[in-house]
Every structure is written in structure tokens, then in C-alpha cells.
Amino acid sequence: MARFTLPRDLYHGKGALEALKTLKGKKAIVVVGGGSMKRFGFLDKVVSYLKEAGMEVQLFEGVEPDPSVDTVMKGAAAMTEFGPDWIVSIGGGSPIDAAKAMWAFYEYPNVTFEDLCIPFNFPTLRTKAKFCAIPSTSGTATEVTAFSVITDYKKGIKYPLADFNITPDVAIVDPELAETMPKKLTAHTGMDAMTHAIEAYVSTLHCEYTDPLALHAIELISEYLIPSYNGDMDARAKMHDAQCLAGMAFSIALLGIVHSMAHRLVQLTAADISFMDVQTQCTCQRLSASTQQSQKHR
């Protein structure tokens, strides 16, 4: 038996951010990374829309790239003190991943990080809060997945946390946020999305539900990544959708050796994970092609 878990609601297209006005609750904590969401005015919009929904709002700012266990614990403590019934995270993969882990510690203060590192071992969430994810980059697709990546810097290890419980309740995929990405980030996240789609398609766990998502993501990325890199904002919107489709596919079909290798190499080299994904993807494809060729001549 297989399971296909996605957010209950996914709002997409320009202006989708306004869907925050429809959330029902009393308190919302907004988890955010660096200053880009504030600088471009999106953080103010999020706070305004949540207040319009009748909620008291508190910010947890400064989630670093490759979020740490320490940051997760600080965020969980802030949530415990504030008592939100909505956790809203906006930004790239890092603040959303961090907020997912914070959510678990907020609802279960006595759980350990080691407990959460066991795949599909999370306690049942949503006893205190629901989760809304708003991506600003077009790569990780953590807004629709059952995964989070947290780094234990004391051990020098990036831990992938996996459980259907941490699939967000609401995802808001608004391309206006992605329009602010610089060219380098557009390229790296776009290739990260392509890697997700390819790995999902060739996964041994792929199925009739994941293949159409992965294939269409590959088609969209092939057509729109370069125009998106060159500043075409319609293409940028297509890429924002494509990375989300890739995320839906790999959340079910899972990833493979490419990401396993890339995560370890990032620890050794401090390179960007998206860049390393591309390098290992190319290496694995060459290896696969040479293996298939040699088998033909046996």
C-alpha cells in the first residue's frame, strides 16, 4: 500500500498571498529567514493579511541557511511562549524546513531531535497549530513535501526529517515572491527542481500518481528555466509551478543517490546544495549511461 499526502489547500498564481486572509485562528507566528522578504515588502503583507483575518501576529526572524538544531529549539521556545494556532513560514527552503521542526517541538516539548531523525516517527501533529508554507524560491518545494532538513553543527551532519505529519496544511505558491530572486539563485534553484523531478521519475517508488507530476515538471523546467534566468517573469511563474509539481512527485516517490551524495559533499565542501545536486546528478547520469552501454555489449 502506498500513500499520497499533499497540503489540504494549495493557492497558486499572482495574488495568492491574499489567501492568508481566509485562515481561521487567534494567533499566528511567522517564521522567516534573512531580510529579503522584509526588504521587498512581502513580510509586511503577510502580517497585514493575518491581522485582517483577525489574528494576533508575532515574528520569528533570522533563520539561517541550512538551519541548525539550536535555531529550531529557539523557535519552538518562542512558539511555546506565544501559543499560536497557526505557524506561517515564508521564504526559501530554510525557514520553512526550520518551522516544520519547530512545530514538532512546540507541540511535543519532550520529544528529542534523535526521535525525529527516525523516518516517519513523528508524533501526531495539529494538536496545537496548523501550518502554512509560502515559498519565495523555486527549488526545494518544501511547501508540499513531508520533509525537512536540519543541520547539527556540533556533529557536522545534515539530517533529513521525514514524516507525513509535517506536510503543510496550506501552501501558497505566489510567483510574485519568486520575481525577486537574483539570477544565480534562479539558476541554482531551477536545477534543484530539475533534479527533484528526475529523481522522482526514476525512483523505484515511482507510480502512476507521481510520474505525470515529475514528467510535466521536467517539461516545464526544460522550457522555462533559461527564459526565467534571463528575466522573463512569465517564465519565472512557470518555474514556480514546476518546482512545486516536482515536490509533489518526490514527496511520494522519494529521492535517491544524487541527494545522498550531494548532502555529504556539501558538508565536506560548504558548497551550495542546489549546485552540488546538479554536479552529482550529472555524475550519476554518466555512470548510469556507461553502465547501460556496457550491459548492451555483454
In which residue ranges do the predicted regions lie?
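Gly/Pro-rich interdomain helix-loop hinge
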Residues: 267-298
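Carboxylate- and glycine-rich phosphate/diphosphate-binding segment that chelates Mg2+/Mn2+
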Residues: 147-253
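Structural motif
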Residues: 9, 28-29, 58, 85-88, ...
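Fold-independent oxyanion-binding glycine-rich loops
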Residues: 8, 14-15, 33-34, 63, ...
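Glycine/threonine-rich beta-strand-loop-alpha-helix active-site module
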Residues: 70-176
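Glycine-rich phosphate/pyrophosphate-binding beta-alpha loops
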Residues: 139, 244-275
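ATP/NTP phosphate-donor binding region
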Residues: 1-86
